[in-house]
Design a protein with these regions (language model features):
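His/Asp/Glu-rich metal-coordinating catalytic cores
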Residues: 2-185, 189-193, 199-215
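Residues that form or flank phosphate/diphosphate-binding pockets in enzymes
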Residues: 86-89, 174, 249-250, 275-276, ...
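Active-site flanking residues adjacent to catalytic metal/cofactor-binding acidic residues
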Residues: 105, 133, 242, 266-267
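Short, small-residue-enriched loops and turns at beta-alpha junctions
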Residues: 110, 138-141, 271-276, 302-303
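Mobile, glycine- and charge-enriched loop segments
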Residues: 124, 259-265, 273-302
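Hard-cation-handling environments
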Residues: 140-265, 283, 289-291, 308, ...
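Internal alpha/beta domain cores that form substrate/cofactor-binding pockets in large enzymes
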Residues: 272-275, 295-324
Length: 324
C-alpha cells in the first residue's frame, strides 16, 4: 500500500502489529550475520514499524456508547467492535451518497465477547441498503460450539494428563481465557513460551483485565531454554500454551517425560494440518501434531455459524446482501 494512502486500525490491533514486527526485527538482529543483506532487512523492518505507528487509530468505545466516526473524503465510516479469533476486530457502517452499507468483516456470536453482536445490530444497523457479511462457514462447515464449552472440554482432559501442551494462537484473547479457566479448574500450573505469546498477553491484560472482571487477565509464567522452572514443572505437571513455531523447544522440554502422561490439545483450525495447500504453505501445525502420540482437538471457529449469519441478515433486513 503506498505511503500516501491513509490506513486505519483500532489501538489494540495496532499494538499487536507493533509487537509482532518489533519481535521480527529483534530476531533478524540476532540471527543474521552482519552483511549488506542484513542491513536491508533491518531497514525494511524499521520502515514497517514506522508505517504502523503512522496508522490512524481509534479507541474502542464503552458499551452502550456510539463509536466515533471518521471521514475519508465524503465517506463516513463508523467502527463497531465485535468478537473474532483475532483480537480487536470491528464491523463498519459506511455512509456515502445517501447509502448505508454495513460491512461485518469476520465475526461470531459464540465467544465471550459475542454477546454484544445482536444488540449492536438492533441499535445501529437500521435502514441498511447493502449488507456485506462473511460466509466462511458456509463453505467450510466449521464447528461452532461456545467458547465456554471449549474451556469445559479442556478442563476435563487436563485433569486426565499430568503434562498438557496447548497449541493456540497468541492473538486470540478469548481462547487464551478458555485455556486459563480450564487450567485453574484442573488445578494445573500455567506456563507459556514464545515472545509473541508473552507480549500479546501483556497487551490483553493491560487493556482488558479490569473491564472483563479478570477474565482477560493473563499471568502465565514464562518458560524458556534451560529455565530453572523446568524441574518444578516436570515434578508437578503443567499446562503450557505455545505457538506452532516452538516445536523444537517443546520437544526438548518433554524429553524424559512418560509419553503416556503427555497430551497435546490442538486448539486451532484443523485445515492447517488437513488441507494439502495449507500444509504446503506452512507444515508447522501438521508437524506439531505428529510429534505427540496423544492428541485431542478442542476448538471452535472464529467465524460466524450459518445460524448466526442468518440471524444477522434477519435483524439487519438489508435491501441487498453480499456474502464473502
Amino acid at each position: 500500500i503506498p505511503c500516501d494512502v491513509p490506513q486505519y486500525i483500532g489501538v489494540g490491533g495496532q499494538e499487536l502489529m507493533l509487537a509482532k514486527y518489533d519481535l521480527l526485527k529483534i530476531a533478524h538482529e540476532q540471527e543474521w550475520k552482519d552483511s549488506e543483506e542484513k542491513s536491508k532487512i533491518l531497514i525494511d523492518d524499521e520502515q514497517k514499524i514506522s508505517k504502523i505507528k503512522d496508522f490512524h487509530v481509534w479507541e474502542r468505545t464503552a458499551p452502550h456508547t456510539r463509536p466515533k466516526s471518521f471521514m475519508i473524503g465524503d465517506i463516513r465510516i463508523t467502527p463497531f467492535f465485535n468478537s473474532h479469533s483475532i483480537y480487536d476486530s470491528y464491523m463498519f457502517l459506511i455512509e456515502t451518497d445517501g447509502k448505508r452499507i454495513w460491512h461485518t468483516g469476520d465475526y461470531r456470536d459464540h465467544g465471550y465477547l459475542g454477546k454484544g453482536l445482536y444488540p449492536t445490530l438492533h441499535r445501529y444497523a437500521s435502514n441498511i441498503d447493502l449488507l456485506i457479511t462473511e460466509g466462511t462457514t458456509l463453505k467450510r462447515g466449521d464447528l461452532c460450539i461456545q467458547e465456554s464449552e471449549v474451556s469445559r472440554r479442556m478442563a476435563c482432559v487436563m485433569s486426565a494428563f499430568k503434562y498438557v501442551i496447548v497449541l493456540a494462537s497468541a492473538t486470540d484473547i478469548e481462547r487464551l481465557a478458555s485455556v486459563k479457566t480450564a487450567a485453574l479448574k484442573a488445578r494445573k500450573g500455567l506456563y507459556y513460551t514464545g515472545g509473541m505469546m508473552g507480549r500479546a498477553m501483556r497487551i490483553f491484560t493491560h487493556r482488558e483485565a479490569k473491564s472483563s472482571k479478570g477474565l482477560f487477565a493473563f499471568h502465565f509464567k514464562y518458560v524458556g531454554e534451560d529455565d530453572p522452572k523446568l524441574g518444578e514443572m516436570q515434578k508437578k505437571g503443567f499446562v503450557l500454551v505455545t505457538g506452532a513455531s516452538h516445536l523444537d523447544f517443546v520437544k526438548k522440554m518433554c524429553q524424559g517425560l512418560s509419553s503416556s502422561e503427555v497430551l497435546l490439545i490442538y486448539s486451532a483450525w484443523d485445515g492447517y494440518y488437513k488441507d494439502p495447500l495449507q500444509i504446503k504453505q506452512n507444515p508447522a501445525y501438521r508437524d506439531f501434531r505428529e510429534a505427540f502420540p496423544n492428541v485431542v482437538d478442542i476448538h471452535t471457529s472464529g467465524h460466524a455459524s450459518r445460524e448466526c449469519i442468518k440471524k444477522v441478515i434477519d435483524i439487519v433486513k438489508p435491501k441487498e446482501v453480499i456474502c464473502i
